[in-house]
């Protein structure tokens, strides 16, 4: 409920902004700190998240499909590595991405947790390693990371039907599925 009206908020960055503003925490109200948080939140939403998501797809799910995916996997792993380098450079100057712990760190942290699966040596990014180690011990982060832990399978043992649902849909097939649901 926003201003007394029911409303859904979607997209991770928008959700984090809404919650942080509502709780008055992890999102500064004054410039230039606010803009710095927004820069790094949008950097995650437009860069780190999508690139890490592509690495995840090609490492965890693409092997279930025929074809050579090595170019794509290498491409996204390299981009993920480059983005960790960007983080490492800024974290050399400050403790957290925007200075103080913020929604920018909250948004970015989950995408760094999979570094081992992506065959990245986090120790080659000393500042990211320090940042990662500081965040992973926060009690709320630990509780959050435990949610759904037993359900994570990273593509192992996933059924063909689930793979089709997750990766072989387009706008037309989704529309047809919605129409079929309406008939029932």
Regions found by a protein language model. Name each.
Residues 1-74, 88, 174-184:
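GST-like domain detector, emphasizing the conserved glutathione-binding G-site
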Residues 8-11, 33, 79, 102, ...:
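An acidic site on a long C-lobe helix of protein kinase domains
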Residues 10, 42-43, 76, 84, ...:
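Tryptophan-centric aromatic hotspots in well-structured domains and transmembrane helices
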Residues 15, 87, 105-106, 135-141:
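Residue-level signal for nonpolar/aromatic packing positions in well-ordered secondary structure
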Residues 25, 89-100, 139-144:
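Surface-exposed helix-capping loop/turn segments at secondary-structure junctions
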Residues 36, 75-82, 86-89, 127-130:
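A non-catalytic, amphipathic alpha-helix used as a structural packing/dimerization or gating element
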Residues 47, 52-56, 96-124, 129-135:
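GST superfamily/GST-like fold recognition
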Residues 148-184:
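Acidic/histidine-enriched, glycine/proline-rich intrinsically disordered or flexible terminal extensions
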């Amino acid at each position: 409920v926003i201003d007394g009206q029911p409303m859904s908020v979607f997209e991770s960055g928008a959700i984090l902004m809404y919650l942080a503003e509502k709780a008055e925490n992890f999102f500064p109200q004054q410039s230039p700190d606010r803009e710095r948080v927004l820069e790094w939140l949008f950097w995650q939403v437009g860069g780190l998240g999508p690139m890490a998501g592509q690495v995840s797809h090609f490492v965890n799910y693409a092997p279930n499909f025929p074809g050579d995916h090595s170019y794509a996997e290498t491409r996204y792993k390299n981009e993920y590595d480059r983005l960790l380098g960007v983080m490492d450079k800024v974290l050399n100057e400050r403790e957290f991405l925007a200075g103080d712990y913020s929604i920018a760190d909250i948004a970015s942290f989950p995408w760094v947790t999979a570094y081992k699966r992506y065959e990245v040596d986090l120790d080659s990014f000393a500042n990211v390693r320090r940042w990662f180690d500081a965040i992973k011990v926060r009690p709320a982060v630990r509780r959050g990371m435990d949610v759904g832990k037993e359900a994570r399978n990273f593509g192992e043992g996933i059924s063909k039907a689930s793979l089709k649902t997750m990766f072989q849909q387009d706008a037309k097939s989704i529309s047809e599925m919605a129409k079929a649901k309406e008939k029932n």
